[in-house]
C-alpha cells in the first residue's frame, strides 16, 4: 500500500494521509482514503510526504490534480536537446477547496517534490518541514547489447514558477556549501 490514513489528530475536520511512494496505484488509493475521510466530515487535510523518495511521474500528476484547478501547470520538463513538455491539471480533483498542509523532509524527493512544488507555486497549500532532497532529473533508460541498461539524463523537472527541482551540483564546492548551510539551519540534526 502506498497510501495510509493516520488517526488520532483529534479534530474530525482535519485528517492526515501519508503517502510512502508514488506507485501505479497511489492516486487510486489516495482518492479512496480521501473519500472515506470526507464521509467522516473532513474539511482540511494534512498530506504527509516525509520520507517519500518519489516514483512515477503520472502518479504525481494525478495526485496534484486532486488539489489544483483546470489548466493549472503542475510541472514541466526541459533539457538541452529535449523540448519543453508541460503537464496540466484537469481541474476535476476532489479536494480543490479545503485547507491543505503538506509535510516534507530532507528525504522527500522527485515525484513528491513535483506535488509539493505545484501546491506551493499555486499558493494552494502550505509546505511544512525541512528542505526537500532536490531530485528533479528526467532519465531515459537505454538497453545495451549485453542485456544491461543505463539511464541517460535528458531533462530536468521545473515547478510552475520555473524553479528547478534538481539541486545544482556543478562542483563539490556547491555540494559542501549546501550541506554546511543545511546543517547551520538545523536541517541535518
Question: Where are the regions a protein language model picked out?
Answer:
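Positively charged, low-complexity/disordered segments
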Residues: 2-10
Amino acid at each position: 500500500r502506498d497510501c495510509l490514513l493516520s488517526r488520532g489528530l483529534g479534530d474530525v475536520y482535519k485528517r492526515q494521509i501519508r503517502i510512502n511512494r508514488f506507485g501505479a496505484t497511489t492516486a487510486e488509493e489516495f482518492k479512496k482514503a480521501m473519500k472515506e475521510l470526507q464521509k467522516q466530515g473532513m474539511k482540511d487535510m494534512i498530506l504527509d510526504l516525509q520520507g517519500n523518495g518519489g516514483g512515477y511521474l503520472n502518479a504525481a500528476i494525478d495526485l496534484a490534480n486532486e488539489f489544483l484547478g483546470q489548466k493549472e501547470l503542475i510541472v514541466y520538463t526541459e533539457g538541452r536537446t529535449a523540448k519543453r513538455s508541460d503537464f496540466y491539471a484537469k481541474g476535476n480533483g476532489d479536494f480543490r477547496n479545503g485547507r491543505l498542509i503538506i509535510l516534507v523532509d530532507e528525504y522527500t524527493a522527485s515525484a513528491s517534490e513535483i506535488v509539493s512544488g505545484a501546491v506551493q507555486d499555486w499558493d494552494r497549500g502550505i509546505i511544512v518541514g525541512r528542505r526537500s532532497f532536490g531530485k528533479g532529473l528526467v532519465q531515459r533508460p537505454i538497453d545495451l547489447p549485453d542485456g544491461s541498461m543505463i539511464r541517460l539524463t535528458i531533462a530536468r523537472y521545473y515547478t510552475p514558477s520555473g524553479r528547478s527541482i534538481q539541486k545544482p551540483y556543478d562542483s563539490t564546492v556547491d555540494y559542501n556549501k549546501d550541506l554546511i548551510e543545511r546543517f547551520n539551519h538545523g536541517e541535518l540534526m
